[in-house]
């Protein structure tokens, strides 16, 4: 068996996430209780309100704390991956898994990232939408045609048949209309609060570059595949540049999954609320087995299956 941990990004968070893990496992509880944030993280995860949980300033530390807690539980059970990767925000969780950042530093860093991303488009109506069943080249052309209404770009190449577009709200709406006219099956607005991975995030990239100067990045203990490459990168010194680039450029998750398959990965543990990434894996490399871990029951089932493999 060759194993990868794949970490969820924003959009799958929901009120109640992590409650049973918190009640069941002291190691998970410790991560959430010690999160270095200026709000009650566990209360927001468990009880909401949903509107606040969906605000990127709060979504990011909540998601990463959840992921760090699950990672600790898996490693405590002797489950250590051969590779790690994540979707967007999940890349920070992958770096934590790989030993590059400890849990408090990772949570604090993504809280800063969330604020920087919110500040980058403050008072600017923006959005993201998933476009189904339209190829990359056609959708890129659609975005170019819609750009008279504002910034709109292809930002997440998730799997065959699903690409996310982001940008100014009017331009995203126009691109959605053009995409449907070009043959897209559906256009689905996403539950996020900003035009992530577009050029509109350049100010956030600048803020992160400055922030990274005081962040202690360690060597990777586990190889990480990076979003903006869809591939491995081994040098510690390149990590800040890749993370700065990531916030304002496209995420190549489909390419990442294909690369994992090329590397011989046959099993993936999806860490985060929901089962979205497992769906992307099945559509991209159906030979890979997926074990989504969101609940205590999921965790127990995954550990039993992986230890028996």
Task: Label the predicted regions.
Residues 11-12, 36-39, 98-249:
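Alpha/beta catalytic cores of group-transfer enzymes, especially the acyltransferase/condensing modules
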Residues 75, 180, 261-264:
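Non-catalytic positions within long, well-ordered alpha-helices that form the structural scaffold/packing
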Residues 22-23, 145-147, 180-182, 283-286, ...:
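Short, solvent-exposed amphipathic alpha-helical segments in soluble enzyme
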Residues 229, 289-309:
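Short, flexible loop segments at boundaries between secondary-structure elements
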Residues 1-139, 190, 267-297:
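FabD-like malonyl-/acyl-CoA
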Residues 248-265:
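A short, acidic, amphipathic alpha-helical segment used as a generic capping/interface helix at domain edges
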